[in-house]
């Protein structure tokens, strides 16, 4: 696809710094009887008692141990994968707590996958319950703002010798927020290089919007205008977008009708 040098892209960001909102303390797509297992958080003394997810107020150069309780409510032995994942921002402008491949910006206070230790694989007999400790090692260097992530527990699908078929795979996610105080870092968003893209046969542009600070942003309005030789050919407004701390929102705009 040729990208005309006469095309001009204008991006306007209107944002509000909002309190961290994660939703329910534990989320899954079905109820326990359908999923076949349950997960619940076990808080420690650093927990904000007003929060239903892990919400920790910590000190630099310290260790914190939290835990989750996993119960196999099915009638079969099952294997589970546990992962602590850094929050990222998906292409829809929503904070994502499940993408283990997403990379945080270099400005992040610390990466959860490097500062946590826990048992990643567990096996439970039918009806068995197990507590899984998670140790957080807080770095020496103090930080303002927050580090966000999620504790993900996924039930593994047994290997089948039969013909491949569509099988539901279930996961629970418990939010994790780590702070060292109530002071927030300043808001700062930056837009990267505008590039042409073709996705599912549609042409458009993509531009990375970076949140370089350690604070989640919500109620974000993105206004974009695409012009050719001064004439507007596409205009779009996206409201109520979110960006995770120290993450990139891969914003895109299609100019096809």
What kind of feature is each model-predicted range?
Residues 2-28:
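Sec-dependent N-terminal signal peptides of Gram-positive bacterial secreted proteins and lipoproteins
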Residues 78-92, 96-105, 216-231:
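Short acidic, flexible loop segments centered on an aromatic residue
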Residues 30-48, 178-188:
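Proline/serine/threonine-rich low-complexity linkers at boundaries of modular beta-sandwich domains
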Residues 62-71, 78-86, 92-94, 107-163:
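Ligand-binding face of N-terminal immunoglobulin V-set domains in extracellular IgSF glycoproteins
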Residues 182-257:
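Membrane-proximal extracellular "stem/stalk" segments
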Residues 101-141, 226-257:
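Intrinsically disordered, low-complexity Pro/Gly/Ser/Thr-rich segments with frequent PxxP/GP/PP motifs
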Residues 68, 162-183:
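Short beta-strand elements
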Residues 41-74, 121, 189-200:
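Beta-sheet-dominated interaction scaffolds and their linkers
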